[in-house]
């Protein structure tokens, strides 16, 4: 697989809308790996289509498998045999590190956006993005992929652990990847939901009269 496709995968996966990343596969229960896979392949497809069209050839994958996406992305003038196995391996590196966050950082509130750790969670995301870009510039793609997996886990946990959707938001929270923008309407530890196991509290009205963002 060419380094160009690796750059596409690494550079643009984080640009996938975070809410899009939570579309279940096959109508079943979403896991971190299924969410990550859906988001990455969707973004790679979108990006490869744009790159192919800019190069003057059609992007017409014969299917949605990683192998078929790789062949369509590289185009008809690609030399040699296209390796879907290498693409699979690159994706697996991301999936593995994504899943290991639950094992290696099980008690870290910022890694999972628990206990109102908004600022710490965003810091992990933004610092991770800086590290990803730096590793891409150095062509250290494996390190970039591994960091991407970890960052995506924390980003996913924001949407699954917070009341973002319950508050009526349908767009990604861009402030999570923009350290120059403030995180607004945040609940503190003393104002968070007193019964977080009970998800039947619409917008947590007793605890959040001003519709504060909480976990």
Per-segment meaning from a language model:
Residues 15-149, 154-157, 161-215:
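N-terminal, motif-rich segments that launch catalysis or mediate targeting to/interaction with membranes
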Residues 3-17:
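Cleavable N-terminal signal peptides of Sec/SRP-targeted secreted and luminal proteins
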């Amino acid at each position: 697989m060419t380094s160009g496709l690796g750059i596409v995968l690494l550079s643009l996966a984080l640009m996938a809308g975070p809410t899009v990343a939570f579309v279940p596969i096959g109508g079943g229960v979403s896991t971190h790996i299924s969410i990550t896979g859906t988001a990455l392949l969707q973004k790679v497809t979108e990006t490869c289509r744009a790159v192919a069209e800019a190069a003057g050839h059609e992007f017409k994958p014969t299917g949605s498998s990683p192998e078929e996406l790789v062949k369509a992305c590289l185009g008809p003038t690609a030399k040699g045999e296209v390796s879907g196995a290498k693409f699979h391996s690159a994706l697996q590196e991301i999936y593995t590190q994504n899943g290991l966050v639950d094992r290696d950082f099980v008690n870290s509130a910022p890694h999972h956006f628990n206990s109102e750790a908004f600022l710490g969670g965003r810091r992990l995301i933004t610092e991770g993005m800086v590290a990803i870009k730096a590793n891409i510039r150095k062509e250290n793609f494996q390190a970039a992929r591994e960091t991407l997996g970890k960052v995506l886990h924390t980003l996913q946990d924001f949407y699954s652990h917070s009341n973002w959707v319950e508050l009526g938001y349908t767009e990604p929270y861009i402030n999570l990847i923009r350290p120059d923008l403030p995180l607004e309407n945040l609940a503190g530890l003393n104002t968070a939901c007193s019964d977080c196991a009970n998800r039947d509290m619409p917008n947590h009205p007793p605890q959040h009269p001003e519709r504060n963002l909480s976990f």
